């Protein structure tokens, strides 16, 4: 379940992450009143469940309350990637000295939470992963031991982040506590800002909650706004898997958030552009794979699909059966490449032998193949 930026910031603040003061406005008049209340420069930010708001014109600075009114008026009602902006966050602008990226996801293969840090914050992290993968530093956290301040300080040093070491470490520990506390599947701060006076603040934030854990958080479940979500994200949620719509033309299906994120990075690195994040989870049966393909192929932007599976509790032959069902029902009208490894790998290959699905032994070969088939980035 996706949260709006202001909701993500409220959660982070609850766990001790510093965030700029901000309030939600539904009208230009409300935006003006909030700006008057703050009495300083503000940023007006569209609240929709998609990325790329800044590029679409959904983030604007305002020096005066009247400007806040005008900028909010321009943003409210705007269509960003198929979603209408119905509210904006009016937040105090921060004086930026440095911008970093910090994000947490679950790596199912390693049974660890992975912390990603980069000195290149404030930009699309997927672009950084594609163009400069060495700029993203990854650290695995044992959830049984937790994440301790001395480990956070060591990670900050290894990633080369500059600023108050202790403050940065405290923010990372608080981010992890928030991630764990609300059962998130993704928690990101981008940018994590070092201000000109040496402060640390989360200028933007993203949290995706694990739908399977919402029963433990009825207060958070009530925040769901179905009308604010992409229709495909709603459908995927109904099927029980994590799906996030992205900007590209290559559908991505994998098992485990870590593997899916790696696959997104890989496709970007070889010149492609992912159309989505879709994690079928562990132990997925054929019907789950079939439903995942249904969702991905409903996206008109998708020109081809890359299925990347590492079989542990997920059996590769079950994945193959789901693909075969989609073939038999005529769903696979776009090229599909697959890389499968692990449990029942050979059985999967035998099942798919002679089928119009392209099998590759490694992820990099599969990524290069699908990018070539769809003609590169969208």
From Swiss-Prot:
Record flagged with keyword Manganese: no
Catalytic activity: GTP + succinate + CoA = succinyl-CoA + GDP + phosphate; succinate + ATP + CoA = succinyl-CoA + ADP + phosphate
Chain residues that bind GTP: 45, 52-54, 94, 99
UniProt pathway annotation: Carbohydrate metabolism; tricarboxylic acid cycle; succinate from succinyl-CoA (ligase route): step 1/1
SUPFAM superfamilies recorded: Glutathione synthetase ATP-binding domain-like, Succinyl-CoA synthetase domains
PROSITE patterns, sorted: ATP_GRASP, SUCCINYL_COA_LIG_3
Binding-site positions, substrate: 255, 312-314
E.C. designation(s): 6.2.1.4
GO molecular function: ATP binding; GTP binding; magnesium ion binding; succinate-CoA ligase (ADP-forming) activity; succinate-CoA ligase (GDP-forming) activity
Cofactors (names): Mg(2+)
Binding residue positions for Mg(2+): 190, 204
Family, per entry: Belongs to the succinate/malate CoA ligase beta subunit family.
Protein name per the record: Succinate--CoA ligase [GDP-forming] subunit beta
Record organism: Thermus thermophilus
């Amino acid at each position: 379940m996706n949260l709006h930026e202001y909701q993500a910031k409220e959660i982070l603040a609850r766990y001790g992450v510093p965030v700029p003061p901000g309030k939600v406005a539904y009208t230009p008049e409300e935006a003006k009143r909030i700006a008057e209340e703050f009495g300083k420069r503000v940023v007006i930010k569209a609240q929709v469940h998609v990325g790329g708001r800044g590029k679409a014109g959904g983030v604007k600075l305002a020096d005066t309350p009247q400007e806040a009114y005008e900028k909010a008026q321009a943003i409210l009602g705007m269509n960003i990637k198929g979603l209408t902006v119905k509210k904006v966050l009016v937040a105090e602008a921060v004086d930026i000295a440095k911008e970093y990226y910090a994000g947490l996801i679950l790596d199912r293969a390693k049974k660890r939470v992975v912390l990603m840090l980069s000195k290149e914050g404030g930009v699309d992290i997927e672009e950084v992963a594609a163009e400069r993968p060495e700029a993203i530093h990854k650290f695995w956290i044992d959830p049984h031991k937790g994440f301790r301040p001395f480990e956070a300080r060591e990670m900050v040093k290894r990633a080369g982040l500059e600023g108050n070491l202790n403050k940065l470490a405290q923010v990372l520990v608080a981010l992890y506590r928030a991630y764990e506390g609300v059962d998130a599947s993704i928690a990101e701060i981008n940018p994590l800002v070092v201000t000109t006076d040496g402060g640390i603040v989360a200028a933007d934030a993203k949290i995706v909650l694990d739908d399977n854990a919402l029963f433990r958080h009825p207060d958070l479940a009530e925040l769901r706004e179905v009308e604010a979500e992409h229709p495909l994200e709603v459908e995927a949620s109904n099927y029980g898997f994590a799906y996030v719509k992205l900007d590209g033309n290559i559908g991505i299906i994998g098992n485990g958030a870590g593997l899916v994120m790696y696959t997104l990075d890989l496709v970007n690195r070889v010149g492609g552009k992912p159309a989505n994040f879709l994690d079928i989870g562990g132990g997925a049966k054929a019907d789950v794979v079939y439903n995942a393909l249904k969702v991905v192929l409903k996206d008109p932007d998708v020109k081809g699909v890359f299925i990347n599976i590492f079989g542990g509790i997920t059996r590769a032959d079950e994945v193959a059966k789901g693909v075969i069902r989609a073939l038999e029902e005529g769903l696979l009208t776009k090229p599909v490449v697959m890389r499968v490894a692990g449990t029942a790998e050979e059985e999967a290959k035998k099942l798919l032998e002679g089928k119009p699905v392209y099998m590759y032994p490694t992820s990099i070969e599969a990524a290069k193949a699908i990018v070539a088939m769809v003609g590169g980035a969208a």
